[in-house]
């Protein structure tokens, strides 16, 4: 299948290789672009390099790409997935990867270690109160910095040549300009995105585990079940 994948411009590196592995091809469509907050980034990095944080949790490759080269004395660093981990590793940072592709896996992963620790969370200008509440409930101290925002591009998604459209976040779905059409298979990268799509009246036929590979595996199972 030919799959249109929602990505921030420049963030889709490696997608084609992964899709080819599963016998598909893909291209990027961008409903959002990134706008950085440089002052907030510098303040956060300086605090980390001064030892004021016990851990940094990167839930996206965007802050990892920007902050990684600036972290000269990083604390414990945890990435939400392998792509984010690889981005950090390029800067020579020793990084751990969560066993699941969701922020909610962070607190169980840290266990008792989190108690009394300052957990840095560089993220988009989109609230995640559930993560903050979970950290506080486990005795940790969340230090959240909204270091960039996602700005709608307003560009209609080019899906005329696609067999499937994969949304990679709830925000990308909510902000996308696109037109449903018969024959266009809708996909969600994970359950959070799927929930946003269902709420928006566009339920996905395929739901992944939060990763591109997991989604393509789910797609292949769907196609086999449909006899395609």
Model-identified regions with their sequence ranges:
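Signature of uroporphyrinogen-III synthase
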Residues: 1-228
